[in-house]
UniProtKB/Swiss-Prot annotation:
Keywords: ATP-binding, Nucleotide-binding, Nucleotidyltransferase, Transferase
Gene name as annotated: sat
Keyword Coiled coil attached: no
Enzyme's top EC category: transferase
Organism: Rippkaea orientalis (strain PCC 8801 / RF-1)
Any Pfam family the entry gives: ATP-sulfurylase
Similarity remark: Belongs to the sulfate adenylyltransferase family.
Full protein name: Sulfate adenylyltransferase
GO molecular function, one term: sulfate adenylyltransferase (ATP) activity
Lineage: Bacteria, Bacillati, Cyanobacteriota, Cyanophyceae, Oscillatoriophycideae
GO biological process: hydrogen sulfide biosynthetic process; sulfate assimilation
Domain of life: Bacteria
InterPro entries: ATP-Sase_PUA-like_dom, PUA-like_sf, Rossmann-like_a/b/a_fold, SO4_adenylyltransferase_pro, Sulfurylase_cat_dom, Sulphate_adenylyltransferase
Pathway: Sulfur metabolism; hydrogen sulfide biosynthesis; sulfite from sulfate: step 1/3
Length: 391
């Protein structure tokens, strides 16, 4: 089943739906005890969900070899569509060997629950170092994305998938808004232009500034924090969501913003992941996407505006979503407001640069981020969470 409501077309033209019908689900359940089974990790589980709900349209499953190779090499699927991140299911030789192409495979979540089915069309080996270098720009195992590639299995399992059923998110059910629902929500609000914002950090003042700048020129903001797998030192999703709720309640016009969770896992692939994040938001119905400083970056692996420059490699019609590029915002002590070099006459010493990394470092030291960094209610929530975490 492929469908979408009015508005911007999903990537590839159709919104993919790989959630099993009641009849399909019963068929899978009847055969469950006779199917070979594999246990998915947190990232593979979230990838299965994103494929099933259409967030990764046009993908209907995990990539076959030909698509995998063109994505790694050229950031395109074999049909020419732009796709910058390989979405694969990697397992060990021991797990892959007994599996036969053409058969169904039962997919279990990390707790062992039966959640999906893979129609195994291919199993193939791949070059981990080559994937790391092309996708992440480095073979350094200290890079969290590269580390995942090196530690995962040596064989990719490919083929279409089905999600047994769409369950409510255990922590954030009210913010679980799938692409078909976000598109309907935009339509009901009469929004024709919607800007998406990706984040794995609590909203600090620089984020708030660029979101509101974008909101000045579009109908609505789709605030879409990622709640899938992240680095261990990233601030936990439940803490971040409470911060977003505070911001929504006190600092944003609620009729112009929709807050929803993004169940994806972070890859930390910098420029390539920026393209990926934009295409995912296009599937959710966004017409624009905010690309800020070092989007989806980690450490010093990528240049400050390398992710923004990546968008210039593609024709606008190939992406089908408009990147809104913002310079590094800072708090200007001369004008006492948020600004960038485009709007502030300040000297370097009059600029307080903000980042999620700086906020995390202050919290670890037990310091309350100043109002130039973070809204006071958000700062209080963060410091309270860190104190409770230490107990």
């Amino acid at each position: 089943m492929s469908t979408h409501t009015d508005g911007i077309a999903p990537h590839g033209g159709h919104l993919i739906n790989r959630i099993a019908t009641a009849a399909e689900r019963q068929e899978f359940l009847d055969q469950a005890d006779h199917l070979p089974q594999i246990q998915l990790d947190e990232r593979a589980t979230s990838d299965l969900v994103m494929i099933a709900i259409g967030g990764f349209s046009p993908l209907k499953g995990f990539l076959e070899r030909a698509d995998y190779e063109t994505v790694v090499e050229d950031m395109r699927l074999t049909n020419g569509l732009v796709w910058s991140i390989p979405v694969t299911l990697s397992v060990s030789e021991e797990i892959a060997d007994p599996l036969k192409e053409g058969n169904w495979v039962r997919l279990n979540d990390p707790e062992g629950n039966f959640i999906g089915v893979l129609e195994l069309t291919q199993k193939y080996h791949y070059n981990k170092a080559h994937e790391a270098k092309n996708v992440y720009g480095t073979e350094d195992s200290q890079h969290p994305g590269v580390q995942v590639v090196y530690e995962q299995g040596a064989v990719n399992l490919a083929g279409p998938v089905w999600l047994l059923q769409r369950d409510a998110h255990p922590l954030f059910p009210k913010y679980q808004i799938d692409p078909i629902e976000s598109r309907q929500g935009f339509k009901e609000r009469g929004w024709n232009t919607i800007v998406g914002f990706q984040t794995r950090n609590p909203i600090h003042r620089a984020h708030e500034y660029i979101q509101k700048c974008a909101l000045e020129v579009v109908d609505g903001l789709f605030l879409h924090p990622l709640v899938g797998a992240t680095k261990s030192d990233d601030i936990p999703a439940d803490v971040r969501m409470r911060c977003y709720e505070i911001m929504m309640e006190k600092y944003f016009p609620q009729d112009r913003v929709i807050l929803a969770i993004n169940p994806s896992a972070m890859r930390y692939a910098g420029p390539r992941e920026a393209i990926f994040h934009a295409l995912v938001r296009k599937n959710y119905g966004c017409t624009h996407f905010i690309v800020g400083r070092d989007h989806a970056g980690v450490g010093d692996y990528y240049g400050t505006y390398e992710a923004q420059e990546m968008f210039d490699q593609f024709k606008p019609e190939e992406l089908g979503i408009v990147p809104m590029k913002f310079e590094h915002a800072f708090y200007c002590t001369r004008t006492q407001q948020m600004a960038t070099t485009k709007t502030s006459p300040s000297l370097k010493e009059e600029r307080i640069h903000l980042s999620g990394t700086k906020v995390r470092e202050m919290l670890r030291r037990g310091e309350l981020p100043p109002p130039e960094f973070s809204r006071p209610e958000v700062a209080a929530e963060l410091i309270n969470a860190m104190e409770n975490q230490g107990k």
